UniProtKB/Swiss-Prot annotation:
Main location: host cell
Record's compositionally biased regions (Basic and acidic residues): 7-20, 99-110, 150-168, 175-193
Protein family: Belongs to the paramyxoviruses V protein family.
Annotated protein name in UniProt: Protein V
Organism of this sequence: Sendai virus (strain Ohita) (SeV)
């Protein structure tokens, strides 16, 4: 019999808990509907009704209405503490101290919700109807000792004197833009950005200053000469060094317009230039290679030129000829200076110079050897 009573009691408690859960869910849905359907509260209106203390305990599924001055009824729900209500039902009933504690919890939650909406815990601590912004905090103490910027000081001044902004608007003065840097002027932007146009987003770097210089006529001439003397093929290199004029700036009292262009070095007959403006190459010796002669100097008797004698081309206009042969069991090496104007035969012989220039240079020719 006791077991049947215990089972029936447990079943009734389970049913009450299930019904309590359904009621709490319906209460939450009803509270959300009431909040969404209510009109937004005017900033200048009286919201002292938010601070009324709730002294009566309500059922978990019931709702109470609080009516303020000049406002409609706002439906709120007492499901903020469903857990404590369910625990009180399970324990078997509610006592008077528990009811008072529940009322205090609901009161604290309502006060916290009102504080989050911009109100304080006092009855009416601030005048919300005079047009001032209650969200602006007072001037906090400068604990770190850091200097404050001018924009912050202006913002605090405008917050302390809200009538100043209204006076500026009434007089037609433009309202200053707070917390923003002034836009750069178009001409200043071009000068600061080194000719890159108006780009307020790219600040001017002081490290770039002084890199660009005004080209002088000397620099222009040097660039032109370098471009002209640059070889067409990368494989061919210049044999003569390129002389670059000094790039030092002229004195301030000197006029660049009267400066004469740099003089070119005098060309000689031994220098030849090709049509592609390649550097001039000096020919050291015009003498043909060994064993070859020009057409007029070749012998008319039909003898071929001598291919064996070695020559010494150390001096212009002369050949050092020598022959090696065997005589009486000895190796004989004979050498002599033969001028360019002489003919080379199979059997070399000493000939006199007929160009009248060799004796002035060669001692052997001058002595008549």
């Amino acid at each position: 019999m006791d077991q049947d009573a215990l089972i029936s009691k447990e079943d009734s408690e389970v049913e009450r808990e299930a019904s309590g859960g359904r009621e709490s869910l319906s209460d939450v849905i009803g509270f959300l509907d009431a909040v969404l359907s209510s009109e937004p509260t005017d900033i200048g209106g009286d919201r002292s009704w938010l601070h009324n203390t709730i002294n009566t305990l309500q059922r978990p599924g019931s709702t109470h209405r609080v009516k303020g001055e000049g406002e409609g009824e706002v439906s709120t729900s007492s499901t903020q503490d469903n857990r404590s209500g369910e625990e009180s039902r399970v324990s078997g009933g509610t006592s008077e101290p528990e009811a008072e504690a529940h009322a205090r919890n609901v009161d604290k939650q309502n006060i916290h919700w009102a504080t989050g909406r911009g109100a304080s815990t006092d009855s009416v601590p601030q005048d919300l109807g005079n047009g001032r912004d209650s969200g602006i905090l007072e001037d906090p103490p400068n604990e770190g000792g850091y200097p404050r910027s001018g924009a912050e000081d202006e913002n605090r001044e405008m917050a302390a004197n809200p009538d100043k902004r209204g006076e500026d608007q009434a007089e037609g003065l433009p309202e200053e833009i707070r917390r923003s840097a002034p836009l750069p002027d178009e001409r200043e932007g071009r000068a600061d950005n080194n000719g890159r146009g108006v780009e307020p987003g790219s600040p001017h770097s002081a490290r770039v200053t002084g890199v660009l210089v005004i080209p002088s006529p000397e620099l222009e001439e040097a660039v032109l000469q370098r471009n002209k003397r640059r070889p067409a093929n990368s494989g061919s290199r210049s044999l003569t060094p390129v002389v670059v004029p000094s790039t030092r700036s002229p004195p301030p009292d000197h006029d660049n317009s009267t400066r004469s262009p740099p003089r070119k070095p005098p060309t000689t007959q031994d220098e030849h230039t090709n049509p592609r403006n390649t550097p001039a190459v000096r020919i050291k010796d015009r003498r043909p290679p060994t064993g070859t002669r020009s057409a007029p100097d070749r012998p008319t008797d039909g003898y071929p030129t001598h291919p064996s004698p070695e020559t010494d081309a150390t001096k212009k206009g002369h050949r050092r000829e020598h022959i090696i042969y065997e005589r009486d069991g000895y190796i004989v090496n004979e050498s002599w200076c033969n001028p360019v104007c002489s003919r080379i035969r199979v059997v070399p012989r000493r000939e006199l110079c007929v160009c009248k220039a060799c004796p002035k240079i060669c001692k052997l020719c001058r002595d008549g050897i």
